């Protein structure tokens, strides 16, 4: 049995949800209604996020990149967590509903690109179009966009010990496949609603301490 860690990006590795930060800064007011429909599950994640980015003109690309470079912050303890992961040969994947144009640059000096799974974007039209290279498999019908539960099935085996780290509705389906869940913010609410056991965290020092405990006691 091997340990497989699957970690969200926006609001988990980074302090803020970068998609929501982009929308608050650059999108028109109607983005807020779409956001609420995603959180309430009135809209699927795929449809909702597609609608959000179709509100963003492509000529804002450089402004968005500069904005994220100035505002995106990596959560405290993440570098130490990754160092421990690497030293102990634990498999680690970023499974992110975020977009390639900001996920890859923000992680380029920390995580190898081949360990990062995220959505793609097309800036060739008038507005940003999201592409979905990691859709739901036959076992998931939730229109996740980037389907985290499908990626877990693809990248690991049932015999592995699955750890999921996340913060929001986009991580909910993945938690249902996890042996251990680390949750913060809105994901805590969804775990409690669905009676999914979780460990709360605010920094990756919290996650690292619990992971060390798991290695010593359970695994």
UniProtKB/Swiss-Prot annotation:
**GO molecular function, one example?**
2-hydroxy-3-keto-5-methylthiopentenyl-1-phosphate phosphatase activity
Enzyme Commission numbers on file: 3.1.3.87
Keywords carried by this UniProt record: Amino-acid biosynthesis, Hydrolase, Methionine biosynthesis
- A family per Pfam: HAD
Instruction: State the superkingdom.
Output: Bacteria
Question: Which InterPro entries does the UniProt entry name for this protein?
Answer: HAD-like_hydrolase_phosphatase, HAD-like_sf, HAD-SF_hydro_IB_MtnX, HAD_hydro_PyrdxlP_Pase-like, HAD_sf
Q: What class of enzyme is it?
A: hydrolase
User: Which reaction equations make up its catalytic activity?
Assistant: 2-hydroxy-5-methylsulfanyl-3-oxopent-1-enyl phosphate + H2O = 1,2-dihydroxy-5-(methylsulfanyl)pent-1-en-3-one + phosphate
Q: Which GO terms describe its biological process?
A: L-methionine salvage from methylthioadenosine
Involved pathway(s): Amino-acid biosynthesis; L-methionine biosynthesis via salvage pathway; L-methionine from S-methyl-5-thio-alpha-D-ribose 1-phosphate: step 4/6
PANTHER family attached to this UniProt entry: PHOSPHORIC MONOESTER HYDROLASE, UPF0655 PROTEIN YCR015C
Q: Which family does it belong to?
A: Belongs to the HAD-like hydrolase superfamily. MtnX family.
Main role?
Dephosphorylates 2-hydroxy-3-keto-5-methylthiopentenyl-1-phosphate (HK-MTPenyl-1-P) yielding 1,2-dihydroxy-3-keto-5-methylthiopentene (DHK-MTPene).
NCBIfam families per record: DKMTPPase-SF, HAD-SF-IB, PRK09552.1, salvage_mtnX
Know the name of this protein?
A: 2-hydroxy-3-keto-5-methylthiopentenyl-1-phosphate phosphatase
**Gene from which the chain derives:** mtnX
């Amino acid at each position: 049995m091997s340990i497989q860690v699957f970690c969200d990006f926006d609001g988990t590795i980074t302090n803020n949800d970068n998609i929501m930060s982009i929308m608050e800064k650059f999108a028109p007011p109607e983005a807020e209604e779409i956001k609420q429909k995603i959180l309430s599950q009135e809209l699927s994640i795929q449809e909702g996020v597609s609608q959000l980015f179709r509100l963003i003109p492509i000529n804002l690309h450089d402004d968005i990149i500069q904005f994220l470079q100035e505002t995106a912050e990596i959560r405290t303890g993440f570098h130490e967590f990754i160092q421990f992961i690497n030293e102990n040969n634990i498999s680690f994947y970023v499974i992110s509903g975020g977009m390639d144009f900001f996920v890859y640059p923000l992680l380029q000096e920390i995580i190898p690109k081949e360990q990062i799974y995220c959505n793609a974007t097309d800036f060739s039209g008038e507005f940003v179009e999201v592409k979905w290279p990691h859709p739901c498999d036959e076992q998931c019908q939730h229109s996740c966009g980037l389907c985290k539960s499908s990626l877990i099935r693809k990248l690991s085996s049932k015999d592995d010990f699955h750890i999921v780290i996340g913060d929001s509705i986009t991580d909910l389906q993945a938690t249902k496949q996890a042996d251990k869940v680390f949750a913060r913010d809105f994901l805590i609410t969804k775990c409690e609603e669905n009676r999914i056991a979780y460990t709360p965290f605010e920094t990756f020092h919290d996650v690292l301490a619990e992971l060390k405990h798991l290695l010593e006691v359970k695994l």
